[in-house]
Amino acid sequence: MVTIVIKRLNKELNNINKEPIEGFTLDDYSNIMIWKGTLEGPKDTPYENGKFKIQFTFTPEYPIKPPNVKFLQYIYHPNFYKDGQICVDLLQNHEWSPSQNVCTIIHSLRSLFMDPNPSSPANREASELYIKDKIAYDAKVKENIRNYI
């Protein structure tokens, strides 16, 4: 089983190196089962110019089960827990399919930066502020990401 995982991860790694993902840099993959990278905040969002460290931890069940994906610092966002875990359907076992991969996860996260889902909050305060006062929400995000520029 582990051999299948390693082959799959090497294939994904080769694809990322051949066709880099916009706004994403793979920083460390010296352990094929744990990848660390940097995800840039998308343009025209309050997260713009932010550089967010992210970690993918793959299990021997990958790609049958999704990797554990988390940010390595606190990001003020309705769908991100304070410990860096991410609340997005794609990363749940019942929504994951083996046809998905690191690229689809990155694209999903970039979309989440552009269009948070306040109806499924990991951070209730951020969700409520996003719904009630988008200007104040954007200001709080910009204040938070100053540490990550």
Map each language-model feature to its residues.
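UBC/E2-like fold recognition across ubiquitin and ubiquitin-like conjugation systems
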Residues: 1-149
